[in-house]
């Protein structure tokens, strides 16, 4: 799986910001760029500042800083995007492989100086080897898309994780968004998990395809991980119903 360059708003926004920033003498984060628009049939339209995707460790939330602090060994950064986490880890002296399905994001990462960038899907069998730390941050469970596909995601992570390895993954329990239980029952169709969401990104005149994204509460992640033969540990709870979890064998 790969993303068409002409339908990749996030990749276009990141590459434009990185290219512009390389010729800008002002400190990082000080140059204004048009934000990414985030559309969803389930929520109000939102905006994501491009600078957020290029943030430094000091600008990261506690959950992300904690994940960087406890990363070790050979590291795989999945869905790397800009990728602020890969760059921070590389600057800390770690060996990092950054992967993304967006060719524009991969170009941006190379421009930022990340040494090992691969334009490849996590599920592509050409991605082989064993990693000590696998990072899936900025709602890492989202990659699964739907709850029914979460076991497949965890199974793939097991294949490429070293015996002494760890998966560091974050997500959020978004039940609070829907109000009380009665509101939730009236909004979410029967048989559908409330954390299954559809999004679409827009940057300037570039409109991406609608995609599925999954938020998972910790108790459910723990249950599914156990069914896949993995241990699931809560590392840190955030202030916005979010959390960082560690999966091990």
Positions of the model-derived regions?
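SAM-dependent methyltransferase
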Residues: 4-5, 12-21, 163-226
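A short glycine-rich, Lys/Arg-flanked "PGG" loop and its adjoining helix->strand segment in the class I
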Residues: 150-163
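Conserved alpha-helix/loop element of class I SAM-dependent methyltransferases that forms part
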Residues: 54-74
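A short SAM/SAH-binding and catalytic strip from SAM-dependent methyltransferases
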Residues: 131-151
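Conserved SAM-binding loop of SAM-dependent methyltransferases across substrates and taxa
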Residues: 82-93
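Conserved SAM/SAH-binding beta-strand->alpha-helix loop
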Residues: 102-103
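Conserved SAM-binding strand-loop segment of SAM-dependent methyltransferases
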Residues: 113-124
């Amino acid at each position: 799986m790969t993303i068409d360059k002409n339908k990749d708003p996030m990749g276009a926004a990141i590459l434009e910001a990185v290219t512009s920033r390389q010729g800008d003498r002002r400190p990082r984060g000080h140059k204004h760029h048009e934000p990414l628009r985030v559309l969803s049939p389930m929520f109000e339209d939102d905006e994501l500042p491009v600078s957020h995707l290029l943030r430094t460790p000091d600008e990261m939330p506690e959950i992300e800083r904690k994940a960087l602090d406890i990363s070790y060994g050979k590291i795989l950064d999945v869905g790397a995007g800009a990728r602020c986490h890969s760059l921070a880890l590389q600057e800390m002296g770690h060996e990092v492989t950054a992967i993304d399905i967006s060719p524009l994001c991969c170009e941006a990462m190379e421009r930022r100086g990340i040494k090992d960038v691969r334009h490849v899907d996590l599920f592509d069998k050409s991605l082989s080897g064993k990693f000590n730390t696998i990072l899936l941050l900025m709602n890492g469970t989202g990659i699964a898309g739907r709850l029914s596909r979460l076991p497949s995601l965890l199974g793939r992570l097991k294949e490429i994780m070293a015996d002494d390895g760890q998966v560091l993954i974050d997500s959020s329990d978004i039940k609070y968004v829907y109000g009380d239980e009665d509101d939730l029952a009236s909004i979410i169709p029967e048989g559908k998990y409330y954390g299954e969401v559809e999004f679409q990104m827009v940057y300037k005149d570039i409109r991406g395809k609608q995609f599925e994204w999954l938020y998972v509460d910790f108790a459910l992640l723990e249950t599914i991980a156990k069914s896949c033969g993995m241990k699931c540990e809560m590392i840190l709870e955030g202030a916005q119903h979010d959390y960082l979890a560690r999966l091990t064998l």
